[in-house]
Swiss-Prot record:
Designated name of the protein: Putative 3-methyladenine DNA glycosylase
Family matches, as InterPro entries: Formyl_transferase-like_C_sf, MPG, MPG_sf
Organism: Corynebacterium glutamicum (strain R)
Highest taxon of source: Bacteria
Keywords, in A-Z order: DNA damage, DNA repair, Hydrolase
Coiled-coil parts of chain: none
Family annotation (Gene3D superfamilies): Methylpurine-DNA glycosylase (MPG)
Amino acid sequence: MYALVTLAWWDFRTVRPRIGAMPIDFLQPAEIVAPQLLGCTLTHGGVGIRITEVEAYLDSTDEAAHTYRGKTPRNAAMFGPGGHMYVYISYGIHRAGNIVCGPEGTGQGVLLRAGEVVSGESIAQNRRGERIPHARLAQGPGNFGQALGLEVSDNHASVFGPSFLISDGVETPEIVRGPRIGISKNTEALLRFWIPNDPTVSGRRGYPKE
């Protein structure tokens, strides 16, 4: 069920090696963009988080996507151009962040599931709680959003500034992909990507058995 992808930074569509840091093309499909985000740092609100776990959500063909039933006021940001934020309220309290992908109108995005706070840790601690261990500060979509200081008003904001800033893609030697978690539809799609053995990854049960 799981696939271990060993990379010298691969472009999944063209299967060609990428060497060094390179800008990410957010107009590509979410499934292509998602693994490229691993290792990148997203900065906002005085905090920088190195992304370690993501999930791709596709267009209206993906029953688990917020865009499955079409465009609404709540998910309108997902139908914007790639490279912009889509923030929604989860379980009535958490702010979960997604980066929109694909051409405008396609309704694709990548959910930011987990990461490591690499700058502004004192700010993230104040937002999350003074006694939260470092590895858990941005572990899980809601915690990621809280540590980063996400609000619904951040919808449509570009990840290229001024409020957000995403670093270029980086070399990631190994990436694991498997089913998304916390959903009830399209559960077998291998659209969750994470850095193996990273302590910040949220879906511990998603690791392959050794």
